[in-house]
């Protein structure tokens, strides 16, 4: 035994150094066993909760692959005995689902890009510029978050109808090109930067737009990622507004297409579930890809600001 070990473990009472070392090893082994037990219980609980959360999705995929003759029986069929992709094929044949998916991608993509641009510009003004009534104006913008969309949907419809914008991409995109939530998110992130950063850039002859594009946006990638994921998923899942302002299949979105799959025949449920499985793939993929950015962006401004 080295001199360091002799100094680190002195004899206590009637116990020798060797007995103390054995006691220390036993205590460490016991603590390690407890830690491993807690970890195993935690992992088991997480797996159980994950299975419970994924169970509806897994059962939906099972129904989508199940012939209607297997679904409507007295037996409880959790898994298809004869898996088939006919439900997916029939879903595309019943309604122009590809067109609906394209429309939803165009709408969600344009809304996402538009909100990132407008919200970042507004947040810059609220964070770095000084003007009369800035605090009151920001409170008014935040107050709009308390107004449900259903309360203004009729007035918005009358407005776009008077402008002749019905059944166009503009009517799907323009009303959602900005949001109070996005302004708040970017402002909280911008508030983490010192005002001296903006003042130094102005002294170097940097314009406001150049300061946003060249300095702010590269430093707020996590906020942009969080905003992009949040906005895209919300736009992809919109139902009431597209249903109200579109009338032709050329402008319908996927959420309306799913409701069109619900007919009176016995295959309607399997067709509808097959359509649901197809349209949730993009939103789930976007969420999985941008999950880290979403969490980081949502919490960074809250913690630092």
Predicted features, each with a name:
Residues 1-39, 71-93:
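Membrane-topology segments of multi-pass transport proteins
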